[in-house]
Curated annotation (Swiss-Prot):
This is Toxin BC_0920. One of its GO terms (cellular component) is extracellular region. It comes from Bacillus cereus (strain ATCC 14579 / DSM 31 / CCUG 7414 / JCM 2152 / NBRC 15305 / NCIMB 9373 / NCTC 2599 / NRRL B-3711). It holds the Pfam family EndoU_bacteria. Probably interacts with cognate immunity protein BC_0921. The interaction inhibits the toxic activity of BC_0921.
Amino acid sequence: MSLNMYLGEVQGQTQSMNAVCNATIQGMEQVIQSIDAFAIDTVLQGQTYSSAKSFFVQTFRPLAQGIIYLCEELIRQNDAFPSQFQSQVASTDVIEQEILEQIREIDRMKASMEAISQAMPIPGMDAMANLFTVMRKKLQEKLDHLYQFNQTSSNNYSTALQLAASIAAGLAEVQSGKGFSPASGTFSTQGLNMEWTTSIQAITEERARQAANSIEEGEMCGKLPEKSTGEKIWDGIVEGTGQAVSDTIDGIKALGDWETWENMGNAALHPIDTLSTMYNTLSDSFINDVINGDAESRAKWGSYALTQVGLGLIGDKGLSKASKLGQAGKVTKLAKNKIPQAVSHITSNLQMGDRFAFAGGNSLRFRFDTPDFKKAEEKLSTYQFARGESNYGGSNFVNENHRSSLSNREIISNLQHTEKFRPNTLKHILEGEINWRGDAMGYHTEVLENTPGKIISGTEEILNDQGIYKARVEVNGTPKTGNRGFSTFFPKDWSPQKIVDNINEAYNNRTYEFGNTYSGIGSEGIRISMYIDGNGKIISAFPAE
């Protein structure tokens, strides 16, 4: 089988594979937001609810987070793959059989020239023979580089394979039937092997440290450097959803599609195969709504993939088709079709039993038909009723113990027009936070209740007749030290959405001041100072003194 690299085709189709990953990232971020909303809901009380919240946060949340990290890693490697080929092998298409034929032709010509030279010496024949020798050497070097690239390129995806292995191990654990106790009616991870979360948690902690450093530096130094593609994706996925837990459960069920992860492992080992087949196997809806659509259609497609299909990775929505690389058949080949040992090892060690079920054709699906999940679905189905929601379009009776209310997280997640803000910026502005060094940061409005940030009594000062004031603040009992301990505050009658809208207006007419500091005039005529990172995202914003 010939080893071929059609560089132009690979570069063009990289966008298709990355689009699938981006849509999956969006869907998984929505799953995480739904789980978080359920976990912090103060209306749902009791032993079963409390244990269920903890169980979902400790199991399904890291699974969704791991999928995000996996997709980000695939995007990084997909973007790097063509450039690595160009630097290591060639800047044009390389077809193994063509190079071999050229080498054989040179060998034939050299043999003919030597025979002629022996029979009848011709001036300049030696120089021509040397030229052919040089040409042959160059072709052989290109071929050797192709072989070497073929052997080493799959190593670039080792991190992705490790993440896929962790995700598969996590899926096996949560389906083991050991997470729910019928006797006590509670959920627990005590009987589960949670080692699979280690690699995912390590990435999460590193991201948190980087984010904390960026916010701290953003208030004290010059412009931050341009971020990588993965970081841009990370900053762009936070969006309010208001998903009910029943939708989250649908998404979680789809996490159990083992075929998806087997295909993902195959995709990682055969990147050229992936890029060569992705475009032709995407469904029409994906091409229309994601590749050729606008931001709204992409968001709608991602939301549909979450609530109606799960992850957007099964059926005709993309990856379960597009990643069947070893089954593609008549496509360009660079590597042999073999399922990686790591993925095969995971497959062989999963206890099948009743946890596997055939779901049409010859595809083997990994299902959440386990006691744990059924109990969770049964117990948590009341979550919609506790929030006054119904699947039938009406309102449900809510008693005094289940009174509907919106948490601060839900209020923030439902804000509109937040595309210009970094993921944690609105929490930073509206609630205040403690950075990784333990310093109190932000807090520029009193509009929300029960926030970490508080005004220190007796320190409030009116700054102007527009309603702007300042005060010394503390966050979770820690006094703020930056800016002499003061924060400036938006008017007390401004809603969170009004604050966002005014910051957006100030952003649109901003002028540069120094470092990464800008200022602009909000829609209500108030001057707003902003810290903006190298990617154009707002780190913090507050009324100017």
